[in-house]
Amino acid sequence: VIKIEVKASRAVDFDSSEPLYVKALAFDSNKRFDMNFQQVKPACCDVFVWVGVWRDVIKYWVLSAREVQNNRYYSAGQHRGNVGEGQLHVKNSNITEFMCYQSTPRDLILNIRAAYQRQYTQ
């Protein structure tokens, strides 16, 4: 049994104060974006499936829990006094570092199994 935590986030204009539905960006936008994957709990799962949503594109990333916990962008302790839970921001400035985890919908099962293997063999 593979324990999976699925998180989704929208790519939104980082520099806008408009409501989320207004500042949602298209994939080919040149504006700075921020996707905040919140309440991430690496100790509670084996694999993460992250869904990044733009107005016109959906991207999937599959990471082992260890890959998330050890990622330099992972921030443990999202809220004061919180234990075992954090957040990770995927932005225009770091998205290329997550390309190796990207998956097509068709390959999600294969990539989930591969991430599970990485979780327990590396």
Predicted features and spans:
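Nucleic-acid endonuclease domains
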Residues: 2-3, 8-122
